[in-house]
Regions:
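Gram-negative outer-membrane beta-barrel transporters
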Residues: 12, 120-130, 149-236, 311-313
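Residues on the lipid-exposed face of transmembrane beta-strands in outer-membrane beta-barrel proteins
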Residues: 5-11, 40-44, 105-109, 161-165, ...
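Repeated loop/turn-to-beta-strand initiation elements of outer-membrane beta-barrel proteins
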Residues: 16-19, 49-52, 113-121, 169-173, ...
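Outer-membrane beta-barrel translocator domains and adjoining extracellular loop/strand segments
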Residues: 31-38, 65-71, 78-82, 132-142, ...
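C-terminal beta-signal and adjacent terminal beta-strands/loops
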Residues: 227-234, 257-315
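Membrane-embedded beta-barrel scaffold of Gram-negative outer-membrane proteins
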Residues: 45, 53, 90-149, 155
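Surface-exposed extracellular loop regions of Gram-negative outer-membrane beta-barrel proteins
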Residues: 1-29, 33-43, 165, 170-181
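Transmembrane beta-strands of outer-membrane beta-barrel pores
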Residues: 3, 23-29, 56-62, 71, ...
């Protein structure tokens, strides 16, 4: 059971500036605790073509440790829960309440390359700082996965650049690049700690999408190219020196659609280059051994896929 209240204050200067500040309070019966979660949003139209946005907020989340980490059931390892106070394996004293602060903002600029206002460039930055988080650690021991809560240094910084351009009528070009710096503190079997990159998180991703539509959007042609950067693969031996990175890999997609009355007929292809992760299941021949592991998937498992479809629009 939970009871809460929320208050919000808004200040605005029409078409120029607005700020929203909010405060929420909740009492949770299960945890027998009262939680305060402040948040705020700001928008400033510096010029008619330049907009600055900022936001921040504190949040809590009660984790469902198994369903949130369902991949742990796809391994041959034992699953244990570690109590912070005693250092023993005890689920009853396991704190499942996560706490994090997210702050960030964006700057958007509209300008003309061929025609006035035909292009938009935006820069985004967001940081999430975790003050308490639940970790499913598969790197402490080789034969088990250990769940524990930690207040060690853990954060995610995300930088993103978006560019959109419509050089001619009905032709849209969109490109984006995102860089992620994500680290977490994990425990070691000797009682110490180590700060490592968050596993299975790509360091960067970039995407290019080009779409062209004929008059009245009778035909729509769409093509997308994507490059996925490397991600750290967690060690399977308990020794952090044995961890490695996945390769960067491309993905290509294409689709064409035809509008006929209220129907849209479309056909396309996913993963055109037929790229697939090799050997995604470790020790597949012995599923009852602790070395069996199918949770470290960093790339596509399905190859090239063609599809056709029919969509009906009611309105």
């Amino acid at each position: 059971r939970e009871a809460g209240a929320y208050a919000e204050y808004t200040y605005a200067i029409k078409d120029k500036f607005s700020i929203v500040a909010g405060l929420r309070g909740d009492y949770n019966h299960y945890y027998d605790r009262f939680f305060l979660t402040p948040r705020g949003h700001l928008k400033w139209n510096i010029t008619p073509s330049t907009t600055l946005r900022a936001s921040g907020g504190l949040g809590y989340r009660s984790t469902n440790v198994i369903t949130d980490n369902i991949g742990v059931l796809a391994t041959g390892r034992a699953i244990t829960f570690l109590d912070n106070e005693s250092g023993k394996f005890d689920f009853r004293k396991f704190d499942r309440m996560e706490k994090a602060l997210t702050v960030g903002g964006s700057l958007t600029q509209t300008f003309g390359l061929v025609n006035p206002g035909d292009a938009t460039l935006s820069f985004d930055y967001f940081r999430t700082q975790f003050y308490n988080s639940v970790v499913a650690d598969q790197e402490m021991y080789a034969d088990r996965i250990v769940f524990y809560d930690t207040d060690g240094r853990s954060y995610t910084d995300t930088y993103q650049i978006d560019f959109s351009w419509s050089p001619v009528e009905r032709l849209d070009i969109f490109a984006t690049f995102r860089y992620t710096d994500s680290e977490m503190t994990i425990r070691r079997a000797d009682g110490g700690t180590a700060r490592v990159e968050r596993p299975l998180v790509s360091k960067y991703k970039t995407l290019l999408n080009i779409q062209y539509a004929t008059k009245f959007r009778r035909w729509v042609f769409d093509a997308t190219a994507q490059l996925n950067g490397p991600a750290r693969i967690p060690t399977q031996t308990g020794d952090l020196d044995d961890s490695y990175y996945s390769p960067r890999y491309p993905m290509f997609f294409a689709q064409v659609s035809r509008k006929v009355g209220k129907f849209d007929i479309y056909a396309g292809c996913e993963n055109i280059a037929d790229y697939r992760q090799k050997d995604p299941i470790l020790n597949a021949q012995d599923p009852y051994d602790y070395k069996f592991n199918s949770m470290n998937v960093w790339g596509p498992l399905m190859g090239r896929k063609f599809y056709v479809g029919l969509r009906f629009n009611l309105y």
